[in-house]
Amino acid sequence: MKYTATFALLILAIGIQTQRRSTICRCRQEDACWPTTAEWSSLNQSIDGKLRHLRPVGLPCQQSAYHKEKCDEVLAMTHNSSWRVDHPESLQLVSWESWPEKNQSCQIVREAVDGCAQGRIPLYSAAVESTKQVQQAVSFAKHRNLRLVVRNTGHDMAGRSSAPGSLQILTSGLKGINYTENFVPFITQGSAEPMGPAVTIGAGILTGELYATGSEKGFVVLGGACSTVGIAGGFIQSGGMGILSPSKGLGSDHVLQVEIVTADGSHIIANQYQNEDLFWAVRGGGGGTFGVITSVTLRAFADLPATVTGIQINTPSADAIFWAGVKTVLSILPELTDAGNSARMIVLPASSTGGASASFEGYTFNKKGAVSLLALQRALDDFGIPFKLSHDFQGNLSRFLAAPKGVDLAGISVIPGSVFLSYDLVASKDGPAKVTSALSDLRLGPGSSFSVDAFGGGQVVNNKNRINSAVHPDWRSALLSLTVGRGVPPGYTLETLKSIESELENDQLPRLRSLEGGRKGAYLAVAYPNEVYFQDSFWGKNYDRLLKVKRAWDPEDLFITRVGVGSERWDDEGMCTRADSGLWHALARF
């Protein structure tokens, strides 16, 4: 882009003026602007007594505040995802409850003596159960300049559901499931075309709850594998991949309408007929960024049978035989997804006992898929790779998906990082070998793993010219979403955390990106939370348009998240603007 001399001088002038401005901060608890007790009481009254003062979930186990019965419950349930959904003072990844930069944490250890600090846990939670209550909470935060976060089930892996000194809007209480045979979008003038079977859900409906209803009524939706994820929250706002993606597309491809409370407290309906810019943005533009979604209408499909094939590879170490098994699995994924089938493989190259394991699960809906998996079994046999095989025929896919799968991990500390791998790479002659070589070079130790999700290709790619949404364009050429999960040891120090982050950011993720010559897109739901070039990694060429939508609907950044749209203007916790934010704000207008 070429700038005129006049424009260059204008930019320089703006920059000089910016340096003279003070940093803008949200109101903090120690500030005079912090709401009084009476004002918090007024908010509580306006939302029908749903305001909660939050303290860390581990507090009852601290020596200074020890409560045996409550501590017993915390210790027994800390790894239970459903329990954490119901406790707004907790998150699924406990690493986001702590604030290591300030040495603030609250260990879940009986009679802990190291103290218990608030960390990143919000100070208050508005446990809303209606749109009106959401509006009241949003308006309260806006008019008092509070740091606001949106939490549904607490699954967010990049820390977007928590922030120090904040007010939380808890949406898990927004329930309701309404199935219709022929959904008609809302329109203010004229008439809209019916769109076929659909289901409208409250933001707090869990994936497992929706699958269970689908099992009863004979429909299935495109959701994820974790039964405790709020499907209307971060799932669809991150794009949403699932086992039906190769045959149907992404979850966000099938969002027909959303209801959302925006930064000015308005209740908005967005679909293809009205508020189209907002409708485009929330389908892949990131959760907690454009407002509080209160309900979503999803396209529903007829329920169907499926066969789940499990292949377990265990070896004493991650030796040549083990990696040959991984390569063999990778080689069949293109043809598997071509036919609308899918698969996931979770790999632990090293365990505490020294063994290595690869757990493969294939989801087939047709004869072609069965043939592909039979070929995989024969190839493993031919290479002398030991494995255990299981088959599970499911006459009702929704019923199978409704049951917990053991993937709802909770009460753990993990730093994720992900990258898309294209169909062309994996389907090429040397592709599986190149990918396997890169994976074996990651040098993952005990407590760390990677997952290979073959949820791209097929209809995800075919929807490139059919669906106009904010998801990263690389989705439309991707076959795999590859996610590295680095385990963080209990009681970790800031130094340990930074060391793990450095390895992931400067070595492991670059190795994977180098497979295709540089930066590739990443799945927003499991992406690296400190991504420097997050704009490109999460949204690519869509970012500029997303930023314009953000400026139009939330010009003061009431809704801001870590590595979210517009977050480059703010510090990591979204509490204060950066020194150069005035220049950034000015440039955003051009």
Curated annotation (Swiss-Prot):
The chain positions of domain FAD-binding PCMH-type read: 117-303
Q: Please report the organism this UniProt entry assigns to the protein.
A: Malbranchea aurantiaca
Enumerate the glycosylated residues: 44, 80, 103, 178, 396
What's the protein called, per UniProt?
Answer: FAD-linked oxidoreductase malF
Q: How is it used?
A: Malbrancheamides have the ability to inhibit calmodulin, calmodulin-dependent phosphodiesterase (PDE1), and induce both endothelium-independent and endothelium-dependent relaxant effects, suggesting their potential as vasorelaxant agents.
Q: What is the lineage of its organism?
A: Eukaryota, Fungi, Dikarya, Ascomycota, Pezizomycotina
Quick one: which gene encodes this?
A: malF
Q: Which residues form the signal peptide?
A: 1-18
Which keywords has UniProt assigned to this entry?
FAD, Flavoprotein, Glycoprotein, Oxidoreductase, Signal
Molecular function via GO: FAD binding; oxidoreductase activity
Which Enzyme Commission number(s) are listed?
Answer: 1.-.-.-
